[in-house]
Amino acid sequence: YRPFDTEDFDAIALILQQLWHNNSDNDEYNRLEAACDLAYCLSSSTFSQVAVIDGEARGIALARAGQNSGVTINEHWMDTERALLSQMRELEPDACAEYLSFVRATIRTNNRLLESSPLPHDNEVTLLAVDRDVHGLGVGTVLLDAAVSHLSSLGATRAHLYTDSNCSWKFYELHGFKRTATHRANREERRHDMPRESFLYELDLTA
């Protein structure tokens, strides 16, 4: 286990592609979409931990502590995200437009979830993804613990994350997170491939 290195990018993006970015018949487009998602997550995170097995990156946890993230790193990944979006538009304009609609709907939903909770808007686990081939080996637990420990070490009293009915939300409950808000997708949101239910989970770091 170690911090994210730029050389991990392609391997981690492939994990995200296999988990969440496989809607298009065009594999190259799916690859770009997953890479774009990863770049976005990296741009808004201040902590990273990667699981390396046999020299290969097989999982990642990202977290954001407070609002003062490193500007240079953020700008690099934001530029990367913009460049990937441009390639996506050229390759599959309709699929790209649908992806952007999904992203906007997700952001709106997450904001609604947070507004309905007394949580502060910082100290978030922004990404947790593990290669399906190593599920069940405890990799996700180590990565999540690393992210939460990092937030706690900086004085955070609570951490939060977003997940949904398409993901392994029970995993977070097993690790002490409690569901504090739920959003059920309406017909319009379902049309944009939004999950049936989206959840906000929080963890008390003082316990």
Model-inferred region functions:
Residues 1-7, 18, 58, 203-207:
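Conserved N-terminal entry element of GNAT/NAT acetyltransferase domains
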Residues 1-14, 25, 65-66:
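A short beta-loop-alpha structural element at the N-terminal edge
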